[in-house]
Amino acid sequence: MNDPLPHSKPHYHLIDGLRGVAAIIVVIYHLGEGFCTSPADLWLANHGYLAVQFFFILSGFVLGYSYDDRWTGMTSRVFLRRRIIRLQPMVAAGVVLGVAAYFMQGSVTWSGEHISPIWVVLAGISTFFMIPAWVGSPLEIRGNAEMFPVNGPLWSLFFEYLGSLAYCLAIRRLSTRALACLTAVAAVGVGGFAIGNATGYYHLGVGWSLSGVIPWGGAICMLFCFSAGFLMARLFNRLPRLEVRGAFWWCAAVIVILLSMPYVDYGGCPWLNGIYETICVVFVFPLLVWIAASGKTTDSVTTFACNFSGDISYPLYAVHYPSLYLFYAWVWANNLTWGEAWPVAAALVAGNILLAWLLLKFYDAPLRKWLSRKGKSGR
């Protein structure tokens, strides 16, 4: 979800690779949602939603690294235009696929209520412009309180824009000490939200809806993750690197394990899940980013894995969910078990990865290149 790094600076290939690993886990996590009734009984990549917090930390780090020393001669308008060019083409693709999937489902809410096509189209338009659907409004076309019911995961792009705006207007102006204080305060907020059981499940699966405390939890997590990423970018050349042999594979394995961990409720103590998620977000994820930024690819296999997974990470995240809406409808209509549905689920993972690659090569990359040239010529 980040701008390409300046050619004059080294590229963090391992960070790109880890973003792709996390994106694939998000797809698997969303597949598992079709077979659970709550966050506590989801058994397939139970903590996959924490990948969004990992993405936010990555975004903060790469944006800080890319732009902290480049504001001389660059305006906020230029920065925000670059962010829009980076993010909006795949938002548009996700909206088109989401609207198409909704029509394929018969234009009905999950409870079976028919929705007029005009509201489906309006929901798509509002999603494109990152205007959330209020709970109970006609734009909330699925009846599931999603912020963006055309394509649910696009809620994180809403917070990505907020984080970019906060960086552009305020955070970049903070001293390193003030930024460290902001990060620490936000970390306490993250821990308080998770361990204090704000959601009812002692978890950080927040931000996807405007219902109750969910958007506030998303804002707190975004504030910490972006601030932590910005802070690490400032400190990276001042503090020791953590060079680990085979860093990409070790970090990828840790991410898979952390995001696949079952709901932590040992001895009937669900607050342990809040502690677990706080540790992951506040301590382990920043450490993994630091290790990845410290390392380099040293062989062709690792280089290919990082380049490919990094390339498809954002397109995959942005466009995979519409097909999962159809998957859910099929599973629930036929009362299928995972044992019966897994071949289709596996095909969806492979198909969405292929779709992400095709969209990147023949739509996203060419369009962004054209928009960037047009933006420069229009200055």
PLM regions with names:
Residues K9, G73-P89, W110-I118, L165:
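Membrane-interfacial loop-to-helix junctions in multi-pass inner-membrane proteins
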Residues F56-S66:
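Central hydrophobic cores of alpha-helical transmembrane segments in multi-pass inner-membrane proteins
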Residues R83, L87-V95, Y161, A187, ...:
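Alpha-helical transmembrane spans of integral membrane proteins, capturing the lipid-embedded, hydrophobic core
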Residues G20-V26, S59, R83, L87-A92, ...:
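Conserved beta-strand->loop/alpha-helix structural units within folded catalytic cores of enzymes
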Residues Q53-F56, L223-F224:
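His/acidic/aromatic-lined binding-pocket segments of jelly-roll/cupin-type domains
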Residues N2-I15, V21-G48, G64-R77, A133-A145, ...:
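Alpha-helical transmembrane segments in multi-pass integral membrane proteins
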Residues Q88-Y161, G191-V206, G212, I279-A293:
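Membrane-interface helix-loop-helix regions
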Residues I15, V78-F79, L87, S156, ...:
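Alpha-helical transmembrane segments and their helix-entry boundary regions
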